[in-house]
């Protein structure tokens, strides 16, 4: 299981939001590239980048920073989400050295786009499913739909999706612990590899997630916990390696 540091980009800076609220952000660094360097030095094997401005604007806003991080670490798999709603944007990111793109809102509103993207860019597409009480949220979490997370994931089982990033938005940035049961259930019922996100707080969460790795949980994204020191990235990754 991979422990994946999150670098959330807002106005060119590395921030964390609480429950997706743009007006409730904490700036962790003015230099996201040096932030990436810190996590690479701590043993990160993949980075999770989010263009927060892009998620709300519906198109990339912090693309230059994403490209700079990809250029600085050409051998490091990077996944990017936020405002990816066109095939040419996916192409731009992949050309810049990003390995995976995360399709969120567009996957809910236009599932055929995911299939089209998977055909055009095999192995590079991740679907981001953000859920509140099991129901999918879109538009930077501003809207909650009538589609369940499990039903949405099942739609993409045969599309060629690389994995699902599943975020429980009630827990994101709140340091309340990860929703292990819902994450494992999504992996089992969809048959797709799932990366957990939202609420990864400490080593207890990592240990609990590791117990369901056999269900198809292949990674955990962590943000606030590693920035504030509640979780040590190297310790968490070493633990996961030791039980694999």
Swiss-Prot record:
It is an enzyme of class 5 (isomerase). GO terms for molecular function: 1-(5-phosphoribosyl)-5-[(5-phosphoribosylamino)methylideneamino]imidazole-4-carboxamide isomerase activity. The lineage of its organism: Bacteria, Pseudomonadati, Pseudomonadota, Gammaproteobacteria, Oceanospirillales. It is found in: Cytoplasm. Coiled coil: none annotated. The active site is at 8 (proton acceptor), 130 (proton donor). Its EC number is 5.3.1.16. Keywords: Amino-acid biosynthesis, Cytoplasm, Histidine biosynthesis, Isomerase. The keyword Lipid biosynthesis does not apply. CDD domains: HisA (cd04732). It comes from the Bacteria. This is 1-(5-phosphoribosyl)-5-[(5-phosphoribosylamino)methylideneamino] imidazole-4-carboxamide isomerase. One of its GO terms (biological process) is L-histidine biosynthetic process. Pathway: Amino-acid biosynthesis; L-histidine biosynthesis; L-histidine from 5-phospho-alpha-D-ribose 1-diphosphate: step 4/9. It catalyses: 1-(5-phospho-beta-D-ribosyl)-5-[(5-phospho-beta-D-ribosylamino)methylideneamino]imidazole-4-carboxamide = 5-[(5-phospho-1-deoxy-D-ribulos-1-ylimino)methylamino]-1-(5-phospho-beta-D-ribosyl)imidazole-4-carboxamide. The keyword Isomerase applies. InterPro entries: Aldolase_TIM, His_biosynth, HisA_bact_arch, Isoase_HisA-like, Isoase_HisA-like_bact, RibuloseP-bd_barrel. HAMAP family: HisA. GO terms for cellular component: cytoplasm. Belongs to the HisA/HisF family.
């Amino acid at each position: 299981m991979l422990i994946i540091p999150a670098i959330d980009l807002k106005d060119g800076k590395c921030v964390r939001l609480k429950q997706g609220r743009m007006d409730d952000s904490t700036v962790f660094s003015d230099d996201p590239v040096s932030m990436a360097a810190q996590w690479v030095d701590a043993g990160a094997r993949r980075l999770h980048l989010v263009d927060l401005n892009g998620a709300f604007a519906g198109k990339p806003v912090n693309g230059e920073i994403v490209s700079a991080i990809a250029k600085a670490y050409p051998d490091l798999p990077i996944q990017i989400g936020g405002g990816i709603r066109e095939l040419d944007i996916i192409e731009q990111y992949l050309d810049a050295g990003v390995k995976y793109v995360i399709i969120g809102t567009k996957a809910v509103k236009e599932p055929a786009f995911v299939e089209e993207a998977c055909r055009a860019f095999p192995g590079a597409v991740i679907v981001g499913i953000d859920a509140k009480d099991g129901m999918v949220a879109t538009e930077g979490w501003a809207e909650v739909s009538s589609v369940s997370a499990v039903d949405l994931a099942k739609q993409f089982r045969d599309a060629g999706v690389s994995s699902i990033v599943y975020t429980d938005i009630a827990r994101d940035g709140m340091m309340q612990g990860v929703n292990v049961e819902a994450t494992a259930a999504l992996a089992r019922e969809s048959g797709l590899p799932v990366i957990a996100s939202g609420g990864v707080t400490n080593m207890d969460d990592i240990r609990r997630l590791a117990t369901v790795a056999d269900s198809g949980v292949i990674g955990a994204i962590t943000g606030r916990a590693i920035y504030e020191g509640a979780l040590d990235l190297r310790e968490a990754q070493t633990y996961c390696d030791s039980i694999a």
